[in-house]
């Protein structure tokens, strides 16, 4: 089982390797860091200029791979390796390497302008996340931990994609001996005094959402009970806030937590095509996020 890590040249943030090694300690596997450098033009007209560029790129690749090996050496219990490849597209190169390595997960870091402890997708990472056929784990900037994965929170919407996600994450939690938390996020404005028909209707709609979420979570509990989960290792939460950031902050988050989100329920392709809710959850998540592709109906009781 292989974790392929995107590791950029002159990387000053080893968060992706840190997360990959944490995952590899929890669900055992090897970590393969891949640095992607620009590819030459490959045309006769380029001549010596192209050769000079390729020599420069090779030097950058060797340097980056050496830096990745140094970072991997900080995790002696994890089997690690580092390579560099040349390509015109970083997402394409990482997906190629994932296919070649038969990787079960890609791991990437956040954009260089992300706040420390937060996730922000660069344009390259965004394209990767939306096109990958395998799960993509995203580390917050500056991520460091000595803990294994101790709890996975599933963003649960009670649609086919969520049930598929729940089934896959339940299996991973068993393998990692991690707790599982099923969380439904409800974003609604603060309640106002019922002084008009519109505000009364708004209150009724929010209450209906929460009742539906509670019913769906009871159904999820029945399914998870059948998969061997017991009370100490299983949690349920409905987190409500006036915006996504505050809804997510309603939950407690600890070192060792991972948040899992699924692909859009309406997208026809088995890829990590994130809907607006998953994208916002990623933006405000205070812990690493795993985006999981697929919208199969497995797991529904």
Residue ranges of model-derived segments:
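Small/aliphatic-rich secondary-structure junction motif
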Residues: 1-51, 77-80, 151-206, 227-235, ...
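Structural beta-alpha unit
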Residues: 12, 55, 70-106, 225-259, ...
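Active-site phosphate/pyrophosphate- and oxyanion-stabilizing loops and adjacent acidic/basic residues
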Residues: 21, 70, 95, 126, ...
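Solvent-exposed polar/charged
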Residues: 22-25, 99-100, 130, 174, ...
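A short acidic, glycine-rich active-site loop
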Residues: 51-63, 202-215
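Glycine-rich, Arg-bearing micro-motifs that act as flexible, cationic patches
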Residues: 105-127, 149, 243, 258-284
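Short beta-strand elements of ligand-binding domains
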Residues: 107-110, 135-142, 289-293
């Amino acid at each position: 089982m292989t974790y392929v890590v995107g590791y950029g040249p002159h990387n000053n943030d080893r968060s992706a390797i840190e997360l990959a090694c944490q995952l590899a300690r929890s669900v055992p596997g090897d970590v393969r860091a891949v640095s992607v450098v620009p590819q030459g033009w490959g045309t006769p007209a380029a001549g010596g200029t192209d050769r000079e560029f390729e020599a420069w790129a090779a030097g950058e690749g060797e340097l980056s791979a050496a830096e990745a090996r140094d970072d991997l050496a900080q995790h002696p219990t994890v089997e690690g390796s580092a390579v560099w490849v040349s390509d015109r597209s970083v997402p394409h190169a990482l997906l190629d390497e994932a296919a070649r390595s038969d990787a079960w997960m890609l791991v990437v870091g956040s954009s260089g302008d992300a706040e420390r402890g937060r996730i922000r997708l660069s344009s390259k990472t965004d394209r990767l996340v939306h096109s990958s056929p395998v799960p993509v784990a995203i580390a917050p900037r500056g991520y460091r931990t000595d803990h294994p994965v101790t709890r996975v929170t599933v963003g649960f919407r009670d649609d086919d994609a969520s049930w598929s996600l729940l089934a896959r994450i339940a299996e991973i939690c068993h393998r990692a001996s991690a707790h599982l938390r099923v969380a439904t996020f409800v974003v609604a404005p603060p309640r106002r005094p019922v002084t008009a028909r519109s505000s009364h209707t708004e209150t009724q709609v929010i209450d209906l959402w929460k009742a539906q979420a509670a019913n769906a979570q009871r159904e999820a509990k029945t399914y998870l009970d059948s998969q061997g989960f017991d009370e100490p290792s299983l949690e349920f939460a409905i987190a409500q806030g006036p915006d996504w950031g505050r809804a997510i902050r309603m939950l407690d988050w600890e070192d060792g937590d991972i948040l899992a989100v699924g692909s859009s329920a309406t997208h026809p392709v088995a890829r990590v095509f994130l809907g607006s809710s998953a994208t916002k959850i990623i933006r405000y998540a205070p812990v690493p996020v795993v985006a999981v592709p697929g919208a199969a109906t497995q797991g529904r009781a």
